């Protein structure tokens, strides 16, 4: 009977579904595994990147389920967001309709691949119940001071007409639509992620060896902790009159280089610069260039060519008394430190680049024979008055102490990370649950009034926020004074939704109506044991999720410190050397692959083509090869003896049979390491192929039966449909359990030993593994007799199971 993928796959998907085979068990005393792949945005169809992500997660979920773990393997949809509004404009369809139609189609696609997701815990973040408890979290955070309002410069996308977080600006462009981003001053709500900066940084230690080093480094750099000196510099008298300021604050991490300062660089937003602008003391050219810098995002400023303009004013060095020129520069950020940076060109690459460009002084204060800039934090100080000849670290501490003693400076800790602006001027998002009252100010909604849902009778035009234009939706009564008020019309950044969905999944779905998180079940299931997703989320979703975990812990909802124990960042799927995209015309449709070859073939190719963390190059021939392997497996299984296993005795097997059995058990042994640790599924599949090839040379019915019993067990998480079909036919699926190794299989009958004379290999021989040391040495001498003739042996060395070395003279 030929292999018919479609019939087999539909049969088993129906059985699994009807028997709720993949739902987590209620017994919270069982050992658990929570396997989660990052949930998708419902764009309409899944792509091969999705297939790879969810196949990896599904393999692990199936494996742990098979060996007796209680497994939670959920899926949902990150369903709020701007693309739904763009689709509404383009296709004249309501964002909600577009979103839920896409969800329905993508669910069908996902389950056609045999993914073992829990259907009962499926959710969409645009569901009213999800919104209700997200709004509850917002209010609780607001009441605790973790969310506040302020007016600030924000990244504004003119195309999407909304605010973007710093992390959502890529090379000066919107991460979603690619449009230029400008700076705009607006009021908004901010999440105080900086309150957890120290803990977010410290707890990265707990994730070492469990998260990719690249992700840990990216988060560490984004948090950007720096310890240093904050100190005051007085302005000279003429500069005081111009700026209406007497001094300025400066932050530095290199107090040891303070005598090397040759200029002070200010952010364009610094009050001294703004005072000069307001008094028209800067020429029009400088004014125009400052405006250009102000419209750049922080990331764009950091990455662009260093530019600056002399302001015509000076500060006085607090120790040497020298005059230091003040410049405005594009690389200084207003909200990092004090918005003013002391520049030491001799010992900082950026400062050196700037000083060289504008012909500014370069003062060396650390002794070195190397070319400048010398940026190492080691060496003896020079040209630093009483601190000469001190090493950098000692000088740094003494200089800071002197500043503190004179009361002109202090030790401070700064972080690069900024509070997270979450207000978005769009319709398709979770409404911010706040009220604006002319009497009471900003007031939270009452919890019993949640969820605050979106009106459906809106016009999506792409111009401004539809909620602002709705004739009645904003109108409400202030819960504090009872007077007429207005609802907040901004909606939440969609990263707010994806920052806690993993905890909602961990909560028993039977409690979803009543509470955000069920204490008992989240305590059992959290943290996620294995999280899987793209590295592009390293400083977006992954950092926000870590913050949310800690904030919800402190609000009493959760108990764990970290949301994800282990993280795997899978590589991209490429075709013709490039990421798949419609514009490049290199997209492979998963539906077409499933229809032609079946889901198991798609899964096998995805896992065999490359290790999960590496990029995967799509190859049509390799897909054909995966299909042929499954057909061959299916065909060979038709000749395997059915029923109970016949016990095999190792001593009764011939050499070829022992070798084939060894290869089967080596594959089983490898499966333990691959499924538990390395995830090198390609090597495991190769080991199974090698075992089957060795088995083909044998004519032992009992051996073939045992081999299929084991190999179908190993491959079931990878190609589940065909393995269930064959295992049911041959073994009534009794092989789907935790299997044990048989040590006697690994005991070799013979040893292959090398013989060296004076360290140089001269011969090899095979001998019984039961031979004594004396027998082995005698055999070694016999095999090297011609090199020993006329020589005397002064030493005999036997490295057990490996080699013999004879020392002669």
UniProtKB/Swiss-Prot annotation:
Specify the protein name.
Leucine--tRNA ligase
The residues that the entry says bind ATP are 582
Q: Where is this motif: 'HIGH' region?
A: 40-50
Q: What are the BP-aspect GO terms? A: leucyl-tRNA aminoacylation
Q: SUPFAM superfamilies attached here?
A: Anticodon-binding domain of a subclass of class I aminoacyl-tRNA synthetases, Nucleotidylyl transferase, ValRS/IleRS/LeuRS editing domain
Q: Which CDD domains match?
A: Anticodon_Ia_Leu_BEm
What is the main EC category here? ligase
One GO CC annotation, please?
A: cytosol
Q: Quickly give the catalysed reaction.
A: tRNA(Leu) + L-leucine + ATP = L-leucyl-tRNA(Leu) + AMP + diphosphate
Q: Major place of localization?
A: cytoplasm
Location in the cell: Cytoplasm
Chain span(s) of sequence motif 'KMSKS' region? 579-583
GO terms of molecular function: aminoacyl-tRNA deacylase activity; ATP binding; leucine-tRNA ligase activity
